[in-house]
């Protein structure tokens, strides 16, 4: 727990408290699961509402979903390639929507109104466990993509154009999930802390610009994560890279 205190008890903000769920020998961060389920439920409601009565002339939620589908399809096609992007479009789209929902949910939903025995609710992506799990999932995905498309020939990538590159390619495989996870975690946590501190110090109007900037940053971070995930998968399946 890292306390942030201010003189004369003007404000106090604590970071690092968690609601733990004990399952066997495992300690799970309960507030992350709760807020994640809220985001997933909201996304399911959005998708069901937009696809329940499909119309040839889309309007409302259907129009929004079709716009997102077209945008993510173009992103996946550009990064992965024409031959393989269809297999990975649902994965890339799910990543983007979940991260976007988590980021915006952390900024817009009044989580502090929900009292917990310990800790407080917030954006799931402001917890390092969430971002590391998604980054490792991306790593497993591009390994699977390369092996399923090329078989053992995939490992030729590690010794091309010369075997001297082998240790550097291995290090790169470790740095990819690290950069993905810490970039997303750091940006979302920093945004929550900045808005939280400003809200404690000057609760009227002043935090609004920081909150709007946080919404923009949150959307960009979701796009960056999805784009890099698609790019890594594209590198694994493209013949010219191996």
Swiss-Prot record:
The chain crosses the membrane at residues 28-48, 89-109, 128-148, 193-213, 214-234. Its main location: plastid. It is found in: Plastid, Organellar chromatophore thylakoid membrane. Keywords: ATP synthesis, CF(0), Hydrogen ion transport, Ion transport, Membrane, Organellar chromatophore, Plastid, Thylakoid, Transmembrane, Transmembrane helix, Transport. F-type ATPases have 2 components, CF(1) - the catalytic core - and CF(0) - the membrane proton channel. CF(1) has five subunits: alpha(3), beta(3), gamma(1), delta(1), epsilon(1). CF(0) has four main subunits: a, b, b' and c. HAMAP family: ATP_synth_a_bact. Belongs to the ATPase A chain family. Key component of the proton channel; it plays a direct role in the translocation of protons across the membrane. This is ATP synthase subunit a, organellar chromatophore. It comes from Paulinella chromatophora. The gene is atpI.
